[in-house]
Amino acid sequence: MVRKIYLALAIFITSMTVSIAHQGATGIVKARMDAMSDMSDRSKQISKMFKGEKDLDRDYIQQSSELFARYAQVLFTQFPDTHQSRMGSKTEALSSIWEDRDGFEDQIDQFVAANGDLQTALEYQVSDRKLRKAFITVARSCKSCHKNYRKE
């Protein structure tokens, strides 16, 4: 079971890896790519902690979760229905973001809720196992959104 969880987490992290395609992005496309890249980098570090490759640092996870919450608040505004946002330089956003706006916003809401659960787990100083489970839920919410709304 643990192997499956780590495999799922590895797939998630791979899908979030910043590609060379980000070079040359401008404007709102670059802003959202930068935010996603930062979340990806932090998620990779947290994943290494849960794999035992790095010491578990709850302060780092807390700071990351707070940053995720700030990024999530602006995600709603970083995908306006404009030509630049839809077709801008190097965008990886699929048209389904605008065609299924309610579904896209539901995905962001799920991420916000999962991240809130992670923050609660940190606040109540739950076991490492429970904290890992909360983080995996956050990671899965990212993967789910990328599956439906991001070019691979």
Regions found by a protein language model. Give the residues of each.
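Sec/Tat signal peptide C-region and signal peptidase I cleavage site
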Residues: T17-Q23
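Residues in and immediately flanking transmembrane alpha helices
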Residues: M16-T17, A113
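Positively charged n-region of N-terminal signal peptides that target proteins for export
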Residues: M1-I5
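General helical structural elements
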Residues: L7-A8, M36
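Bacterial N-terminal signal peptides
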Residues: A8-S15
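Sequence context surrounding c-type heme c attachment/ligation sites in exported
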Residues: T26-E152
